[in-house]
């Protein structure tokens, strides 16, 4: 599952101008609890997202959409160095749960 998240970041999000210098070590862990995928990124990943011009909302929903379609889950939660961050200086509330948004996926 961790490998799948890494592939998503390198393939899908690379087209969005995702910051260089991130490695697979920036995905600290991925697990499923009940109907939720839990993704734990490094603090370095949080800093890279803050520093980039990346559309955080699109990133969150691209990852959510791919994970919900790939695994038998309904929700995704993101953590950075084990913590649920409210924001990364953007308009996304990272501390909450993300559900599949079929409108964004079209």
Predicted regions and their residues:
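Bimodal "functional hotspot" detector
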Residues: 1-106
